[in-house]
Structure formats: structure tokens, C-alpha cells
């Protein structure tokens, strides 16, 4: 275990610090950083990943909201190799860091979902992302259609990224010890052949509406968008539920609704 736990974790920042050296080594190995990588770490905390990353990189950018941690990072590391942005990651403009970004981090559980949605806006600037998240969240991210874990988060993130759960991390690997298991997920932006909605805001509204009442059929949840004959045109069974549709089918629904509104 890493010995340095001087900083008291703050609940309002959702802080749980990774202290297991074996897990840290496994994460670094999975990331496989190269010296010239444009690598960004969100929430460096006590530097569990920061320190080994700096040994392998020419330069590292970190984003940290906790001013005490920022001060500690400034004391512990050379500013020639480390750029610190003291800001809430939810408000950070990742496009300012240029292209081909590799983003990593042990994300606070209390902001993980909104942060993933925020990052998805910058997917054209991103090569890949490696995150430690609550295991349940990762399972929802990578879930297949027609499973209980498949939901709005699955559809909206799979629309942008190919994702894979790499390995799980037990609660004992953190200080303080959380009540849940964690998992490492890798996210890579989809290539240009992936389906793209012509109106992404409409796509998002339709996905949200479909999953607003999971146990109801699409005939009910999408009644504001589709009538009986529309389901026939789309070759989609109106008696299915939201979790039964693929990302591509949601894109088809959004594009169909858009084309109909332009007639």
C-alpha cells in the first residue's frame, strides 16, 4: 500500500484515494504511456497515478479542484513537467489542450456520470480514456441491449465510444474504503463509420424519453414522437421496451422524426 495518506478525503469532492501499489501498476500498464503522449489526468489526488506517469512522460497535465491537493502537487513535482489546472473538470474546456488526448483518472463517484457526458462533447480531441469508476456504472456503460444494466447511459456513451471493462478493483484498494467495488474502463471514440444522428439534440431527447419509464413500451414512452404507422415504417415493434433497441435503432428513430418534421 502507498503510505502517504496525509490529505483528509473530502466528501463533497467524492474523494477516495487509490493506495494499492499492485492496482496502480496494473493501471499504468494498461495505459502504456509513451513519452510524447498528450496525457491528461483528472483528479490526481495523492498522486497515485501522477508520480508513475511523470516518470514515463515528458509532460503531464492534471485537473484538480481541491486547492490543498494542488498545493501538494506543486510542492512534490517539477512544474517543468507538470501543468496543473485548478478547476472543476465539469467546467473545463478540454479542447484547449489540443488533439490526440489520452485522459485518465480515478473519477469521483458523485460526478462520474455528468463528467462522462461532459467529456463526450470533446471526443474529436480524444484518442482514448482510462477511468476508475464504480463497478455498477461501468457495467451500465458497457451493457448490451436487452439486459437489465442497459439504459440511457449505455446508449448515449456507446453512441460516441467503444468501451471495455478491463478489470475490477476491491474496496480495500482505497482510503477511505468505499462501500462499493470499482472497475477500470477504457473508452475509445468510434471511427467515422459509426452511425451519427443528423440532430443529436433530438436523438438525446428521444433516448431520454424512451428510458423515462423503463417498464412501459415504446408505444407509450415515445408517443410524443411516433404513431403506430411510424413504428411500421421503422420496422420496430412498438411493444418493445427501451432496453431492447440498439444505438443504431435510436439513431434511425431520431433521423426519421427529423425528416418527417421537414416535410
Predicted segments — roles?
Residues 233:
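Nucleotide and nucleotide-moiety/phosphate-recognizing core
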Residues 214:
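Primarily a LysM-type cell-wall glycan-binding module
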Residues 1-209, 229, 243, 248-252, ...:
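Catalytic cores of RNA-modifying enzymes
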Residues 221:
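Conserved active-site loop/cleft motifs that coordinate metal ions or position small ligands
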